[in-house]
């Protein structure tokens, strides 16, 4: 799957998320107000959503398109449907 997505972009985003989660962990130990911690959790969640968009876009641009072009449209549509359902469940 790596060849089908923007891996460099995805890795950059994931490293940022790792930093955000580590910062949240430190905030808990530093007795930071709950509202501030929740704001950072929301930011990390939004960043994960952005990663999901990158993966979904790669899936559509490559996996689904390849399936349709090679005459396996039904399988490509099923794969697309599953990917969209999983992405929607992230919300």
Regions found by a protein language model. Give the residues of each.
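Solvent-exposed interaction patches of small proteins and small membrane subunits
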Residues: 1-91
């Amino acid at each position: 799957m790596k060849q089908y997505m923007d891996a460099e972009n995805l890795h950059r985003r994931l490293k940022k998320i790792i930093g955000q989660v580590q910062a949240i962990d430190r905030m808990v130990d530093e007795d930071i107000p709950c509202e501030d911690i929740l704001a950072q959790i929301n930011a990390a969640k939004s960043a994960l959503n952005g990663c999901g968009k990158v993966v979904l876009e790669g899936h559509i641009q490559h996996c689904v398109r390849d399936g349709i072009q090679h005459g396996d449209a039904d399988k490509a549509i099923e794969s697309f449907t599953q990917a969209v359902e999983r992405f929607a469940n992230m919300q």
